[in-house]
Amino acid sequence: MFKFQTNGFSGYAVRYSPFYDNKIAVATSANYGLVGNGRLYVLSIMDDGNIITDISYDTQDGLFGVAWSETNENHVLTSSGDGCVSLFDTTLKDYPVMKFTEHQREVFSVDWSNIDKNLFCSASWDGSVKVWSPGSNRNTSLLTLRSLASREEKTGRIEKPIPVVQPSQVPMSKTRPNIRNDNNDCVYDAKFSFHDPNIIMSCNSDSHLQLWDTRLPNPLFMDFVAHNGLEALSCDFNRYRPFVVASAGVDKLAKVWDTRMIQPNVHSRPPRALNKFMGHEFAIRKLAWSPHGPTQLLTCSYDMTVRVWNDSPSPTSRVGLLDGASQPHAPPCSKIFSAHTEFVMGCDWSLWGEPGWVVTTGWDEMVYVWNTQRLQ
């Protein structure tokens, strides 16, 4: 296990470089992301296990998301609390080379397409997912996908805002007024499919998992409640099984879905997950499928642990198929990493080198690099 401390800044997101097995980008925020500045760290893992800072960038607002470019090994995207997405060139100091400023609230995730490598998407608390093309030197979005508006158009029903109790208005941003989203459709995560460049998946605060096809006049083609009405915080496509996705949320569950089994009728009962992983004591903040096989899933949680799960193809190990059991048996996780001493907010797998290497970061101002296969 290797470690690095982001002194004074809490980790929110971390990603391995798609070009190098020893390069990591970490998005951090001061004061736990509630108010204050942010900092982007670009780190290198040395042969002796030390982790050093190649370069860092201070930002005017806290950083919540990070992604590497798929076309340039020196380009890194960040998303921040002021609604801004910034593109940094690590060969240049101090300032981003491009900024994208259409979002009206915090941007919690960014993801670069690994098929159409000219595109990335961003997910925001303003209820939208936006698609961008920085390669054309264009800082306006190509497409905006609106969670609630698309659902109302699809169902023909106008949904009333869910009342949210807010005893105190703590600003998440010091550079832009904290605009309330009374529709409760804050989008936490959005990902491009690994199998189709036109497909995007997103999850939001009203528990919906949504799939979009950017070629369609109404892009929303699948929409269902994934986490029992509680906030859905993270989602990911399986790299080896085109129709299999995973989601995680405040209900403390990571769920595996086969999209071929989801009924298109939004008025039907909630769909049944292919598998459920139970074990975290608090909400799961982030999950990621392994790039080295179709079954391993990594989750990190507010319970300060990181867990590795095995989505076995055996029917007897899948909770979703055990409706006849009075006490369904939860598939045990294969590994538990408990070095973090605060909320674990971000995790990622290394694409290169020996399979099993992952990186995690959290509010304890620590970045840990460790191998899931060597963990006892």
UniProtKB/Swiss-Prot annotation:
Matching InterPro entries: PEX7, WD40/YVTN_repeat-like_dom_sf, WD40_repeat_CS, WD40_repeat_dom_sf, WD40_rpt
SUPFAM superfamilies named among the record's database cross-references: WD40 repeat-like (SSF50978)
Recorded phenotype for the gene knockout or disruption: Specifically disturbs in the peroxisomal import of proteins containing a peroxisomal targeting signal type II (PTS2), and fails to grow on oleate.
Keyword Transport found: yes
GO molecular function: peroxisome matrix targeting signal-2 binding
PROSITE patterns for this protein: WD_REPEATS_1, WD_REPEATS_2, WD_REPEATS_REGION
Source taxon at top rank: Eukaryota
Gene Ontology biological process: protein import into peroxisome matrix, docking
Post-translational modifications: Polyubiquitinated, leading to its degradation by the proteasome. Ubiquitination is dependent of PEX5 and PEX20 and takes place following recycling into the cytosol.
Start and stop residues of the WD repeats: 58-98, 102-142, 182-222, 226-267, 279-319, 339-376
UniProt keywords, alphabetically: Cytoplasm, Peroxisome, Protein transport, Receptor, Repeat, Transport, Ubl conjugation, WD repeat
Location of the protein in the cell: Cytoplasm, Cytosol; Peroxisome matrix
One cellular-component annotation, GO: peroxisomal matrix
Residues spanning the membrane: none
Key word Translocase present: no
Stated family: Belongs to the WD repeat peroxin-7 family.
Function: Receptor required for the peroxisomal import of proteins containing a C-terminal PTS2-type peroxisomal targeting signal, such as 3-oxoacyl-CoA thiolase. Specifically binds to cargo proteins containing a PTS2 peroxisomal targeting signal in the cytosol. Cargo protein-binding triggers interaction with PEX20 and formation of a ternary complex composed of PEX20 and PEX7 along with PTS2-containing cargo proteins, which is tranlocated into peroxisomes by passing through the peroxisomal docking complex. PEX7 receptor is then retrotranslocated into the cytosol, where it is ubiquitinated and degraded.
Description of how the protein assembles with itself and partners: Interacts with PEX20.
Protein name as annotated: Peroxisomal targeting signal 2 receptor
Organism: Komagataella phaffii (strain GS115 / ATCC 20864)
Gene name as annotated: PEX7
